[in-house]
Regions:
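Secretory/organelle targeting and membrane-embedding segments
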Residues: 2-174, 178-520
Length: 520
């Protein structure tokens, strides 16, 4: 048998970077940003485009068309954009790249509800395409309030700007929230599908722009050691946490109509559940992956009204101390009613009714002004049999735990038991940890780079389909109904800077089941 050949240090990284598929540029196109002068565009989208340009993924030629009601011209918008890039880019942007992006940016002023705005946009798109030798490939990013989603799509259709013809494509990117309940989500889907085919609609979830989330597919299906034990025989339970230290800040008006459940669970958290629990797809084709995700969402058991009372917890933060600073209660935030019953914390215990996950609880938790900022997936395995250790000082065997951290630092850690050095048998817990930044280096990212790139190449894998959106809302409909029918009597019920209401921790019964974040 020949000797094993070790790869030279750094060889894996170099092969990943140089692989042709990774260097595929997006299709030449014009990105139309409705709400192009707003915060999302300034802080996330434009910096993400700068990063794509520096990494060599932005198509050439490429142009931006911003559409807003602000009293600006193309020249004044370009000046503002230059300053915004300097302010919000995650690192200094190469001057030549910044200049090229700014020079290929154009501006249309108009009301989103005015048909003349779309005629003006149509004319400008034609001019820019001719001037810059661009095909008529357009993707429209709706960085606007949800009330404009249907209106803008209807107007695009009426102006002939949504129709795909002569080999050119049209795509529409829609931000969350996609509806505020099952009824409104269905209505919005029906409205936009009168204009667009499903393959043209990209319902974006920026959580899926995180490398660790995308790595779930590689981690599960690209390694022979994990998938065989990824089922009810070996896993005790799964905890998915999205904890934020920030409060609602200046978004009190929006949050009053949303709350933590609507804001985070049917989109962000259910996407993480579906990627964690899905069956292997037949390929990495977008619909093959999303078919399996949709099966998980449809298999999630909706809670009965009685189960809502025992398997959900809601909370609202009171005044408290965070990072050594006093912070106000939710009811004292701007644009929040002083008697508000809106929840800023939500926790649920759910089950997936299929062969792989039958009887395994999934604990979901999200909240504002919690003790630590962390988004993670924690898989706790079943404990080993204790018989062998009955005559030793070991009192219990701690369960193995796999923790996939999405933010703030992207990492994967596996904890397992090891003997503590010494003459007697004692168990300690040790960790094997992989940190993305340590191995691959730390590249600046807004979380939108991969998603924008996928829009340009037409890969919808990381975007939700209509059936996925509606399935997510279906699961929480009973929770919304019960919570609305029974206003909370104990709000506020957790201090800012803590881990939320104590009832959330009490949902984790049984030996070894503890709140993952509190234990970390």
């Amino acid at each position: 048998m020949g000797e094993a050949q070790l790869l030279p240090e750094g060889d894996v990284k170099s092969r990943i970077v140089k692989s042709p598929i990774w260097k595929r540029k997006g299709d030449p196109c014009i990105m139309v940003i409705f709400g192009g002068a707003g915060d999302l565009s300034k802080r996330k989208l434009i910096p993400a485009l700068c990063n794509l340009a520096e990494q060599g993924f932005l198509p050439q030629p490429f142009a931006i068309m911003a559409v807003t009601y602000s009293d600006l011209t193309t020249e004044t918008f370009r000046q503002q954009m230059t300053e915004d890039i300097k302010t919000f880019a995650l690192r200094p942007v190469d001057a030549a790249i910044r200049q090229r992006l700014v020079e290929h940016t154009h501006y249309v002023r108009g009301d989103f509800a005015d048909p003349d705005t779309y005629e003006q946009l149509k004319a400008r798109l034609g001019e820019v395409a001719n001037q810059e030798n661009l095909p008529a490939n357009y993707f429209y990013y709706l960085a606007v309030a949800p009330r404009f989603f249907g209106e803008i799509v209807r107007r695009l259709g009426a102006a002939g700007l949504a129709r795909e013809e002569n080999g050119c494509w049209r795509r529409v990117v829609i931000e969350k929230p996609f509806g505020r309940d099952l009824h409104s989500a269905r209505a919005l889907n029906a409205e936009i599908k009168q204009v667009l085919d499903e393959h043209q609609i990209y319902r974006i979830d920026h959580y899926l722009g995180k490398e660790t989330v995308q790595n779930l597919l590689m981690f599960r299906f690209g390694n022979g050691i994990f998938e065989p034990i990824w089922n009810r025989r070996y896993i005790d339970h799964v905890q998915i946490t999205a904890a934020e230290t920030v409060g609602v800040e200046q978004r009190g008006g929006y949050y009053e109509t949303s709350g933590a459940l609507r804001d985070m669970v049917p989109n962000h958290l259910f996407q993480l559940v579906s990627l964690t629990a899905m069956e292997p797809p037949i390929s990495f084709d977008a619909n093959a992956v999303r078919d399996e995700q949709a099966k998980i969402l449809h298999a999630m058991q909706a809670l009965s009204p009685e189960e809502v009372l025992s398997k959900t917890v809601r909370g609202q933060y009171d005044a408290g101390v965070l990072a050594g600073k006093q912070v106000p209660a939710y009811r004292a935030e701007p644009n929040v009613r002083p008697d508000s019953s809106t929840e800023t914390f939500a926790a649920l215990k759910l089950f997936i009714d299929n062969w792989r996950w039958s009887g395994i609880p999934f604990y979901l938790r999200t909240g504002k002004h919690l003790a630590r900022r962390v988004t993670e997936i924690s898989i706790q395995f079943r404990s080993a049999p204790f018989q062998l250790f009955r005559s030793t000082p070991v009192e219990t065997l701690r369960a193995n735990r796999l923790v996939i951290t999405i933010q703030p630092e992207e990492s994967i850690a596996l904890s397992f038991g090891a003997k503590v050095p010494g003459p007697i048998m004692q168990q300690g817990t040790v960790d094997m940890c992989f940190n993305y930044a340590d191995y691959f280096g730390s590249a600046p990212s807004t979380g939108y780079e991969r998603l924008l790139y996928d829009c340009m190449i037409g890969d919808a894998t990381l975007f939700q389909r209509a059936d996925m959106v509606e399935a997510g809302w279906s699961v929480i409909t009973s929770v919304l109904d019960v919570w609305q029918a029974l206003p909370p009597r104990d709000f506020p019920n957790y201090a800012a800077g803590t881990w939320g209401p104590k009832e959330a921790q009490e949902m984790l019964p049984g030996t070894g089941r503890e709140g993952r974040a509190q234990a970390a």
